[in-house]
Amino acid sequence: MSQPPIGGAAPATAAASPAAAATEARLHPEGSSRKQQRAQSPARPRDSSLRQTIAATRSPVGAGTKLNSVRQQQLQQQQQQGNKTGSRTGPPASIRGGGGGAEKATPLAPKGAAPGAVQPVAGAEAAPAATLAALGGRRPGPPEEPPRELESVPSKLGEPPPLGEGGGGGGEGGGAGGGSGEREGGAPQPPPPRGWRGKGVRAQQRGGSGGEGASPSPSSSSAGKTPGTGSRNSGSGVAGGGSGGGGSYWKEGCLQSELIQFHLKKERAAAAAAAAQMHAKNGGGSSSRSSPVSGPPAVCETLAVASASPMAAAAEGPQQSAEGSASGGGMQAAAPPSSQPHPQQLQEQEEMQEEMEKLREENETLKNEIDELRTEMDEMRDTFFEEDACQLQEMRHELERANKNCRILQYRLRKAERKRLRYAQTGEIDGELLRSLEQDLKVAKDVSVRLHHELENVEEKRTTTEDENEKLRQQLIEVEIAKQALQNELEKMKELSLKRRGSKDLPKSEKKAQQTPTEEDNEDLKCQLQFVKEEAALMRKKMAKIDKEKDRFEHELQKYRSFYGDLDSPLPKGEAGGPPSTREAELKLRLRLVEEEANILGRKIVELEVENRGLKAELDDLRGDDFNGSANPLMREQSESLSELRQHLQLVEDETELLRRNVADLEEQNKRITAELNKYKYKSGGHDSARHHDNAKTEALQEELKAARLQINELSGKVMQLQYENRVLMSNMQRYDLASHLGIRGSPRDSDAESDAGKKESDDDSRPPHRKREGPIGGESDSEEVRNIRCLTPTRSFYPAPGPWPKSFSDRQQMKDIRSEAERLGKTIDRLIADTSTIITEARIYVANGDLFGLMDEEDDGSRIREHELLYRINAQMKAFRKELQTFIDRLEVPKSADDRGAEEPISVSQMFQPIILLILILVLFSSLSYTTIFKLVFLFTLFFVL
């Protein structure tokens, strides 16, 4: 049963609904809450004239006309008929206007209403539910199923419905099911884009462009029932303006419900869109046989209304009102006439809205947190990349440094390998390394010597402080002993005075007074015994210290014996050690300490003897007192205590005897150690030169010695020839001088003496060198041979007195010059003899110690012995030459007068002796064995020639 179109007969308020919806959208913007919305005063009329004019311009069909009462009655009858038939045929269609959204719903008349009663039409505010209940309106019979609304959704949700077409709806009491829903009016409007949720959509949902009529469903007759689902959309048509041309007023209930519906619709739109799409995909269009629904906003609104409050729908019965909305402002199903919602529904809606707001806030916070996490992740990634880049750069720098170090080490390694190969091929020794090592060794020796001196100083200070402490202790003990002795003497004087005064008739008090001194004596003896015990303990400690020192000295002596061997045994091969100066200093220091300790012990022994004598005297006195008063029982006790004291004194005497013996043993041991130290001093003095040579130097010295042997063999022959020539020249010179100037002739005795001297010299030359004595050691100055030669120089008395001297002054001056030059030459020869003798002794020591290095063979030993014999013969010839020179000087003796003491000028005789001196110097230099001795000799001879 189709319902006739009523678009032309709609009141003016229905035409004014789009403008009202737009105004309400401005009053209630998106996102505003119910608490912030302003309630308008009910006394102020709404601007209906302006809205009516706007709606009239938009509506093509009589928009400004009013429905008369007859028309309303016809509409009510038609609605009643539709309700009756709708229960049988299907859900009545809620008429929708297409295009611009001039959507109207047929108002449903409640059951039992008077036919002439005024019913709310499209655009008018819905009456409250209480008034409808008072009128006795009842709900229609069988409920309609909500899915029928969803079946009218078109296949394409975004397409607008065709102009003038109406879709079948699910509203109660609608027109005939499946009727043509075309309208007379309804200006077409373009549909909004998909997903657009602006103010226009909400305005179109409220009223559409042509006004949205609210189709009120009849409420239940009982006042306690809650309104159906259609009552939630009861305020959807409020924005339509006043009915007719009169000014309608706002009511508080309508405004509150409208605000609630506005916010609820706004919240449900998003959730309903997804459900609509799912229903559209699954199956739609079974009920929409006449025309498709105008777009996704209608489906969203329908689903939102259907699923908003299922509990309310179950409470009030199977009643539903269909609601739809066009895409361009579409049609909505009319709400029931009860516009006042129930308080429970309002509370549920508020709770749902609060939950939605909370969820939104949580979503916003989660979004913000996600954004922050993303930024943090980006920052962490950037920092990680930066750190990786920095680490990579550092690793590159470290790799470069390591490469540089490797190159440097490779260069050094190659250099060292080259040096090693060169040394292996040529056998050369790195002189620079040896010099650096020698320098380091010298520095280390200097530092060790300096530290040793400092240690000696500290040790001396320590010993001095210990001595002072011991002296102070001894003085303290002496003072204590003197104090005790004075006290004893005072007590003895008191006893004597009491004995002189006393008699047998003395009172008991005096007897007690006599007995007290003996007790005091006993106490004094006990104190003295305590002191003696302390002294004995001190002596024991010192004896323990001395025993430790003795053990240490014995251990060191054993070390020296194992290191150097006994005096009678030959030198060990592995001889080594520090310089003898440091060893001597250490031994001297230890010897000094032992001597000081021995002196201290001796003093203590003397003091103990004095104390023992004093104690013995006191004991004798006490014994006499014991014999005098033996009858008394107190004296018996005192005698027992005295016997104990005697035993202690006997023990102390035994300890003192023991200490005396120990001190005597220590003194003997110290003497023995000093004797051994002196022996080691003499022994170690001859081996200092050999310790400073290492294997490398010995090899070099052996090569130098081989070269020196050849030169010595060559020079020895030359020296012998030159000596012979010198003798001949000297004899000729002497004869010539004596014949020309002095006229002296040698006597046969002189010739015999000379021949005897020559024989002795030849005998000395033929003898082997004396190898018992090894030259000057320690404090000795020269060798015995040099001293004997100097002592055996002929005196002036052996030669006859010269004859008369020539009287000429020039001859006498020449003789003086010759004598002075001869004396100078004699001095130089003496020095050369002394130096050569020391060199020979050093060479002998080196030969004797050659086995230390294990480098001497039998052939080398024999060649060295021959070489030393040759040097010995040269030295003997020099001594013989010195003798001849002395005889010549004695023969040339001229008495010196005061007038002749002037400056001496050298003559040509010195030029004759200079080649001999140079040859001797060369011989000595090439026969030396160490660079230090060569340096010393060169320095001496240069100093001699300079002077």
UniProtKB/Swiss-Prot annotation:
It holds the Pfam family SOGA. Keywords: Coiled coil, Membrane, Phosphoprotein, Signal, Transmembrane, Transmembrane helix. Residues 164-180, 237-248 have a biased composition (Gly residues). One of its GO terms (biological process) is regulation of autophagy. Its main location: membrane. Residues 1-21 form the signal peptide. The keyword Membrane applies. Residues 9-24, 72-81, 109-137, 214-236, 287-297, 304-325 have a biased composition (Low complexity). One of its GO terms (cellular component) is membrane. The modification Phosphoserine is found at residues 569, 781. InterPro entries: MTCL1-3 (IPR049885), SOGA_CC (IPR027881). This is Microtubule cross-linking factor 3. The lineage of its organism: Eukaryota, Metazoa, Chordata, Craniata, Vertebrata.
